[in-house]
Amino acid sequence: MKKNEFVSLCYHYIRPKKELDEFPKLLGTDIQQFTDHLKMLEGNYEFISTRDVFEILNQSSYSLNNPGMLITFDDGLSDHFEASKILEKFGIKGTFFIPSCVTENNLPANPIIIHYSIAKFGIKKFLSEYELALKKFNLLNEKN
């Protein structure tokens, strides 16, 4: 990578260690792994903000000493509060994308509901309940 190029690394779930996690089957990055990622990345990349990205893309006089790394988080999860404290310790600005359903309706995004349901009940139970719901609302194509 050239020095004024950048990549973006997106995180979703930043979880406690499996043995302490209420949802151990939820696929994600544990807090220690996240911290280790940042330590590894800081030696090879220059952490940048969305403002920096704007400057780079608009070919201003902005200059990076190393390739840039933008750290982002999707879905507006409570996990990200813990991640923000870690970012602050490293002096890194993260970009957090929060779905409008979280702020307007106080509800998680649909994929989050699915992920937690599968983590709690398993895929077979989830699919069984999903099929029942499809039948209840006449959404199941009987040919399938």
What are these regions (language model features)?
Residues M1-I71, L77-N144:
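Terminal accessory/targeting
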